Amino acid sequence: MKPFKLIFISALMILIMTNATPISHLNAQANEENKKLKYEKNSALALNYHRVRKKDPLNDFISLLSGSKEIKNYSVTDQEFKSQIQWLKAHDAKFLTLKEFIKYKEKGKFPKRSVWINFDDMDQTIYDNAFPVLKKYHIPATGFLITNHIGSTNFHNLNLLSKKQLDEMYETGLWDFESHTHDLHALKKGNKSKFLDSSQSVASKDIKKSEHYLNKNYPKNERALAYPYGLINDDKIKAMKKNGIQYGFTLQEKAVTPDADNYRIPRILVSNDAFETLIKEWDGFDEEK
């Protein structure tokens, strides 16, 4: 009886924490039912992940009990992630670095079945469960870092990766790191994004600090920013342009075409449901080689 009580209490505690201050559940994509992904011949998929959690009975129980969007829409299990990568490889996906993704976009022509893998926040689950899979298959990826919180052990209930762990990933040559703001990834009262609600002056200072950190520590930086919660407005785009940021990424269920606005480049938030109903059904994987 005692082990069951311990599991139940632990589940309730995690459930409360998960629903209390979720880091990533405001964007419109998470609130819509999955639809068929529109296909255009000259396009690429930007696949975004947040958590790659270990599959175990407790996590499954919490997911079932809570119906939490943080778990359902922002997480895949390690088994699901590995299966998704294997499926993409089996269907001849051309995995791109961010540098290659930008190069093809600017040239106006993506290779067939182009896929760019990227992660927001970079918490411990990415190091534990995604990094080994990508390393095994030699697949490049981009991590968007909240640069003032590298190594934070309780950032909105997340354990973010340490610099030592990020350095290890970077040194493989498979990873590049970009900005997810320096210290503006949070929600204010009324579920307002701290980044969007900040003044241009505050946003500019934050961007400069984040870029300074990245240029100093991970100089393959492409001067890109993934928006907290996938949300952006024209005012913040002005601040980005003033401070040399050339590319900005949202969260939308759309493939990327060369003519996409460089400050509103869509990324598909990957859950297992989204992968099954959107990615596997995308007509781009049926193109002749």
From Swiss-Prot:
Changing K236R: In strain: 97-337. One of its GO terms (biological process) is carbohydrate metabolic process. Residues 113-289 form the NodB homology domain. GO terms for molecular function: hydrolase activity, acting on carbon-nitrogen (but not peptide) bonds, in linear amides. NCBIfam families: PIA_icaB. Catalyzes the N-deacetylation of poly-beta-1,6-N-acetyl-D-glucosamine (PNAG, also referred to as PIA), a biofilm adhesin polysaccharide. In fact, the IcaB deacetylase converts 15 to 20% of the GlcNAc residues of PNAG to glucosamine. N-deacetylation is crucial for attachment of the polysaccharide to the bacterial cell surface; it leads to the introduction of positive charges in the otherwise neutral PIA polymer, allowing electrostatic interactions. This is Poly-beta-1,6-N-acetyl-D-glucosamine N-deacetylase. It comes from Staphylococcus epidermidis. The gene is icaB.
